[in-house]
A protein has these predicted regions:
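Transmembrane alpha-helices and adjacent helix-loop boundaries
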Residues: 1-201
């Protein structure tokens, strides 16, 4: 469980950071930023995470000459995959801001970065928080795919136990319960946050 949590938390931090950058780039009027950002989102949303994990683990070292451990290959793949979804959350939040606020920022002489950090992002944070929390729940669930390249997370651990005791029904049922215990508080918190902020928007 600790490896699953470590993998998920690292992917959360990296995907949030990269997703914010990509989301802002997608809304940029500069084609050199918006075009690659849009393709980045499409590529990682329109290909299976499992394929991305396998490709980064087996193919990326061939291209770059750098070997990644199974853990870090999974972390990178999960971070890149989820950052595409985070980028869309940020983009949707940015689009939802009243255009009059942006125009007012221009009149005040604020540049694009200042408008984002001082006017837009503070307003949309409340709207983005529930889907971002849900995003972490998705990361926890998807982390099980890391077992395909040998990361010793929950699913891989259970598979090893089953090879010794041949009790798949009991072990996979326990595994499902463990994931439920991990994910339910996150999902419940996201729903509560959504209701809380909905009353204040």
């Amino acid at each position: 469980a600790l490896i699953t949590l470590e993998l998920s938390l690292l992917a959360l931090v990296f995907s949030m950071s990269l997703g914010l950058f990509v989301g802002i780039a997608r809304q940029s009027k500069r084609y050199i930023l918006s075009f690659p950002a849009s393709w980045y989102v499409e590529i990682f949303r329109d290909t299976p995470l499992l394929i991305q994990i396998v490709w980064i683990y087996y193919c990326l070292p061939i291209l770059l000459g750098v070997t990644l451990t199974a853990f870090w290959a999974s972390t990178v793949a999960l971070s890149l995959h989820m950052s595409a979804y985070v980028a869309e959350i940020f983009r949707a939040g940015i689009v939802s801001v009243d255009k009059g606020h942006v125009d007012a920022a221009k009149i005040l002489g604020l540049n694009y970065f200042q408008t984002m950090t001082r006017i837009i992002l503070p307003q949309v944070f409340r709207r983005m928080l529930p889907p971002l929390v849900n995003n972490f729940a998705d990361i926890l669930k998807l982390s099980a795919l890391a077992s395909v390249i040998g990361v010793y997370e929950l699913l891989h651990s259970v598979d090893n136990v089953i090879m010794n005791n041949f009790r798949p029904l009991e072990m996979y049922s326990v595994l499902a319960l463990v994931y439920f215990v991990l994910i339910f508080p996150v999902a419940f918190g996201a729903r509560r946050a959504e209701l809380y902020f909905a009353r204040r928007i």
